[in-house]
Structures are given as C-alpha cells and as structure tokens.
C-alpha cells in the first residue's frame, strides 16, 4: 500500500513556518548563534540553534498549557501547520520522536531541594517531564483515538517515527498518522553532550561553526524545535481530494551490532541505506539527492562518507547536510530533514552544504552541493544515525 505525505509543518532555527524555512534553505541561511548563559552554567561551548519560543496563549487553554513541555509547544505549532496544510483537524494516530525532557526534571529537583515538599510542585510537571510529553499532550489536543506512541531512539528518533507510521499505514492499521520529532533547546538538555567534547568551539562567527564534511570541522552545534508530517494511505488521500506532496517510498533500520555507544559504524550505515532502497524497490543510481546525517564531528562524517561512497560506487547523487545551517536538531532531526527534503522536492532545488571549504579525503569523492542548485529532485535518501547504534533511513519520492 502506498503511503503519502499530505501536510508538513516546521518550527526551527531556520524559521517558524514552511515559507520562512523555504527561504532559509534556498539562501543558505544559518540559524546558529550564541547563548552566553551556557558559559555561566558551565558549558565549554555556547553555540546553539536560536529557536523562537511559541506564544500559545489564545491558541490553547491555560490548563492544557500547564502540562506542555518546551518541545511539546514546538511540536504543537509544527503539527498545527501540517494538519492545516493537509486539510484535517485530527489524525487517526500520532507518533513522535523525543528522547529527553530535561528542563522539567531539573525544575522538579530544584523545587524539592528548596522546599523539601512535593506539594510545591505544579500539577503539570509530571506531564512535562515524561519522555512521552509530546504525544500525550498532542493526542489530547487533537483528540486522537488511534495509535499514541513516542519513539525514543536518540538522533534517529524522528526518522524512525516516520518509518513506523508509514509501516502501520501500509499494513492497513491506520489511515492517517501525524508523525514527526521534537527537541528541547534549553541549556539543561545538552550539558551532557557538551561534557563529551563533541561541540564546535568556532564562536568567532557562529554562522560558520557547523561544517559537515569539511576537513577542519570541530564538532556539532546543538539545536532543536519540531517538525511534523501528515502521512496517509494513498487511497484515503485521493478519496478526499488531498494534495499529495511526496511518497514515503522506503524505510530502512539497522543497529551497529556492538562497539562503543557513541562510535558510528560504516557497516551499520551502509546496511540501513541499502534496506531503505530495497524497501522502495530502487537502486542507488536512481537517487537524486541525499540529505546526509553529517553533524560536523570528525569521526561521524568520515564514517558516513565512507558508507555513501560504497553505496553509490561512483554514481554521483547530489549530497548536502542541512545541519550546516541548522546545527544538529537531535531527536527531531530525522523528521525535520524529511520536511526540508520535501520542501526541496516541491521547490525544485537542493539546499547547500554551507561552510564546506576543504573537503577531506572521503568527502572529496562525493558530489556535495556547496551552493543552492536549481535542479529537479524526484527521489531523496535521508539518513539519521543515533547514539547506541540506532540507524534509520527514509526514501522519499516526489
């Protein structure tokens, strides 16, 4: 059964709606800046994606807002846009990727530390602090009666959410699923990442701090927000006369099968991409564009480039990492990059891999778009790899 996308929504450092984000992608605009308070808190790098906080007063009842985490707010705004584009008020089900809710947990700890009494804690804290904070809130707001599921799989969470949603629709278990990913941006959420020493320290010019595939890359820049997609069976979408934006043609998943939790695997990366292509019944030479996972870390980008070079065997699909503009949107990245890819397919362009000045030995073999290209984009491969060896790849078709 064919699964199609009929609505997309986005709230990110590139903009707070599809139109704004489209312009940012076309112009190669960076959404990265500096949060100086992170240095006071103890971070070694103050770089972050700058994401506007939504104003939900007047959109959602006060009591309902009390249980919404930061990332649930982002997800509501992205979902609202996606459902409006699809011409729907409510989906059958909801599946979102989210792997932390740090701010609510820290705030709860501070209340207990100060008052030594849980009665001082707000009633909404429990709903903000659970990993399922996004889906529990949105399922209530949108009156969902079908699947209600949170996918927790590190930086592949958003991509897996789309893949699982598409699988359920293919199996005839749901007609319409709202899916996506969300990521909190507050400083509490990313301190443990900073402790690993994986962040870029290029603070002189934040817009140049994220350098995927560049020989001189220093590390990633954390970011966040939310992305949402409305997935439907082709039969359901055509019956109601919906505009079809793209098809989720293939979904691949793999695990690295061992090793250090933070170490990428060429074998796992290659396997997940091949499984996505097999699921879509296509070969690598049919891919027009790859939205790479590349985050700007020395080892991660190298391993992905090696896997891509093995997969394509000389075929030159265009490749770029939109993380060069957004930073690493972590739990939402797989979903946001699916949205970015659909925007490119609809607009007939490929967004640039900005800040790539000196390719390394592996990336030099690839056909990387360093400036915006006005070309048809019919089939996209989008990669997402996460800590713990969880990998997801999506094939999207125009």
Locations of the language-model features?
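ACP-dependent fatty acid/polyketide chain-elongation machinery
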Residues: 1-63, 235-247, 339-353, 397-398
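Conserved beta-ketoacyl condensing-enzyme motif
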Residues: 5, 20, 26-153, 182-190, ...
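Acyl-CoA/ACP chain-elongation machinery
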Residues: 173-218, 251-264, 292-301, 316-366
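Cysteine-centered functional microenvironments
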Residues: 62-67, 96, 116-128, 145-161, ...
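Conserved small-residue
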Residues: 7, 25, 79, 94, ...
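Glycine-/small-residue-rich "gating" segment that lines the acyl/pantetheine channel
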Residues: 116-122, 163, 167, 184-239, ...
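Condensing-enzyme catalytic core mediating Claisen C-C bond formation in acyl metabolism
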Residues: 2-6, 26-34, 204-280, 289
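Active-site-proximal alpha-helical scaffold in enzymes
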Residues: 75-85, 131-134, 139-142, 148-182, ...
């Amino acid at each position: 059964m064919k699964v199609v996308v009929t609505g997309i929504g986005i709230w990110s450092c590139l903009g707070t709606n599809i139109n704004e984000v489209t312009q940012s992608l076309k112009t190669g605009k960076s959404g990265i800046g500096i949060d100086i308070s992170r240095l006071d808190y103890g971070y070694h790098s103050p770089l972050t994606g700058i994401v506007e906080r939504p104003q939900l007063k007047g959109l959602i009842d006060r009591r309902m807002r009390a249980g919404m985490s930061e990332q649930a707010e982002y997800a509501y705004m992205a979902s609202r846009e996606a459902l409006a584009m699809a011409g729907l008020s409510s989906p059958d089900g909801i599946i979102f990727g989210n792997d932390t809710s740090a701010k609510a947990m820290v705030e709860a700890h501070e209340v207990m530390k100060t008052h030594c009494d849980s009665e001082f804690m707000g009633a909404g804290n429990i709903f903000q602090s659970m990993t399922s904070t996004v889906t529990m809130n949105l399922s209530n707001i949108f009156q969902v009666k079908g699947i209600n599921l949170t996918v927790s799989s590190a930086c592949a969470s958003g991509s897996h959410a789309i893949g699982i949603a598409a699988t359920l629709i293919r199996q005839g278990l749901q007609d319409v699923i709202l899916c996506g990913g969300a990521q909190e941006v507050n400083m509490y959420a990313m301190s443990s990442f900073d402790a690993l020493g994986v962040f870029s320290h290029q603070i002189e010019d934040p817009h140049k701090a994220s350098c995927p595939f560049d020989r001189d890359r220093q590390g990633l820049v954390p970011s966040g927000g939310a992305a949402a997609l409305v997935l439907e069976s082709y039969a359901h979408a055509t019956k109601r006369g919906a505009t079809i934006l793209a098809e989720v043609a293939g979904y691949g998943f793999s695990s690295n099968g061992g090793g250090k939790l933070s170490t990428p695997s060429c074998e796992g990366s290659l396997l997940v991409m091949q499984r996505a292509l097999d699921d879509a019944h296509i070969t690598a030479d049919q891919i027009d564009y790859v939205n790479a996972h590349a985050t700007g870390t020395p080892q991660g980008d190298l391993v992905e480039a090696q896997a891509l070079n093995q997969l394509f065997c000389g075929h030159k699909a265009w490749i770029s990492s939109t993380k060069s503009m957004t930073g690493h949107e972590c739990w939402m990245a797989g979903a946001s990059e699916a949205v970015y890819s659909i925007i490119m397919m609809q607009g007939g362009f490929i967004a640039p891999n900005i800040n790539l000045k000196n390719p390394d030995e592996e990336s030099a073999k690839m056909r990387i778009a360093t400036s915006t290209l006005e070309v048809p984009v019919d089939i996209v491969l989008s990669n997402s790899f996460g800590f713990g060896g969880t990998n997801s790849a999506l094939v999207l078709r125009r």
